[in-house]
Amino acid sequence: MVELAPAHFADGNNMLMWATLMLLGGAVGKSAQLPLQTWLADAMAGPTPVSALIHAATMVTAGVYLIARTHGLFLMTPEILHLVGIIGAITLVMAGFAALVQTDIKRVLAYSTMSQIGYMFLALGVQAWDAAIFHLMTHAFFKALLFLASGSVILACHHEQNIFKMGGLRKSIPLVYACFLVGGAALSALPLVTAGFFSKDEILAGAMANGHINLMVAGLVGAFMTSLYTFRMIFIVFHGKEQIHAHAGKGITHHLPLIVLMILSTFVGALIVPPLQGVLPQTTELAHGRVMTLEITSGVVAIAGILIAAWLWLGKRTLVTSIANSAPGRLLGTW
């Protein structure tokens, strides 16, 4: 279909535009992008191993694969392709705000998934095809790790999912704490040591290289929000006063999957390059100096989010509580 389309349709053909718009609609619904995102948070009610498989690695990202596989059609309808990037940019920022006010540990990860798929849509919209699939792969590693680790937390806390009823768990479940640190660092794209940094940086570089500065800025805003809500969750769950007596998981069946995914969430996972040569078009590359500038900027943004999260939820918890109970805070939480 993709190969035959250029012989039968001219670029910008109305029928082709409607076809790609319908494909985009299916991808948006499948991958929980705005405005068809409402189902994803409720889907988190399933067991965490299921979430680790279908919400981190396979089912929810199928919309990304659909657009990447039919890229030839979208290249013939540049207006629809640009719309893909806009939807991704809006989704990644809005989902970041939503994750910042969640109290259920799995819902934080649900909105995080929505936001990260927004990055993939942004990459597709700026023709950074390889970067979209690369981030799909690295996201599968660290998000599966976070979902499995969250399941371990929930079981250790007697099926409690409210993060504000936890606290101080780093001493009772140290392996899971390490998993959250590694997975959270990868999700936040901590520079050089995590797989998420390399894939997310490729997306931002693709946006800049193709002249989509506004989408690149949205990606940087999303990166700040990501590190903020991720380490908010980690600091609330694992630091502070212990509120519940947790029972650590035992045995190789519990430890081994977490350890394997921890390793793949580091820079080791970024060494696994998907064999996409000849499958997807080449992406425009930035000059080396501009790449370095972008890497430093995105790294500073990620670290700034982590430091602010530490300042707010490790040092100024009363300030956060007062803001949350204020009229603007309640309005933001409702929104």
Question: What do these predicted regions represent?
Answer:
Residues 268-274, 311-314:
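Membrane-interface helix-loop junctions at the exits of transmembrane helices
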Residues 74, 167, 279-286, 332:
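Generic preference for hydrophobic/aromatic residues in regular secondary structure cores
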Residues 4, 33, 255, 272-273, ...:
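Selective for proline/serine-rich intrinsically disordered segments
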Residues 197, 247, 278, 320-322:
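Short coil/turn segments at secondary-structure boundaries
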Residues 4-7, 169, 207, 279, ...:
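Residues that form generic nucleotide/phosphate-binding pockets
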Residues 254-264, 283-335:
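Membrane-interface and transmembrane segments of multi-pass membrane proteins
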Residues 1-250, 262-271:
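Hydrophobic transmembrane alpha-helices and their helix-loop junctions in integral membrane proteins
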Residues 247, 270-293:
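Polyanionic (Asp/Glu-rich) segments that form extended negatively charged tracts
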